[in-house]
Amino acid sequence: MKEETTTTTTTTTTKNTTKIIRNEDDDYELVKVIILGDNKTGKSSILRRYHYNEFELGVSSIGVDFIKKDYGMVNGKYYKIQIWDVNSCDRFRLLTHSYYKGAHGFMLLYDCTNQESFNNLQFWINEIINKSPNSNNSTIVIIGNKCDLVNGIKIDPIKSKQFCDSKSITSFQNVSAKDSININEPFEILFRQIIKKGHSQTVSPKHDTYENNNINKSCNIL
């Protein structure tokens, strides 16, 4: 499993510029996001494209996978982002529910060419409400993947926006993991909304053993 790590930064102060001092032992703010949606909507592909800028047909998660990356300084605090891709199969459901704990935001994904995946968005919203301990404070963004399949699109962007507006949820149509269309924007929107609300977890690197002790090593993107 790949993970970006923070390197030690130094401070250089000149007459016109000042760089912020930060090292690996400093506390940071962690934002945890979970990607949800029906099978074959492209959740693993979206995560792979966003983090590694790669695309491979047939990629899927086995149970749970995650990436962690540096986000940067916001209002004097240093942020890291943890994004989880959880398998939506029923046989993994009990496992994946446990990873909802501590989530600050959710990205709900549907397939622009699959009406059922759009219809099931309400199911995933209910999952968050019923299974996430922090659902009242969670931020949600809904995106439609596979917009590159122009001739097969079945979901009207207006209909998608109307649904999201009725739920007070941000919508972001026209995303393609395959063609790398608008991949960064919905993640950035979600992160900004979470940080603006002040929803994050302060982490001390000296005690940050979560990845080493709690991740099932077989749950990787393959």
From Swiss-Prot:
Location within or outside the cell: Cell membrane
Gene Ontology terms, MF aspect: GTP binding; GTPase activity
Cleaved propeptide residues: 220-222
Motif (Effector region): 59-66
Bilayer topology annotation: Lipid-anchor
Entry superkingdom: Eukaryota
Pfam families in the record: Ras (PF00071)
Cysteine methyl ester modification, residue list: C219
Protein's recorded name: Ras-related protein RabT1
Organism whose genome encodes this protein: Dictyostelium discoideum
Gene that specifies this protein: rabT1
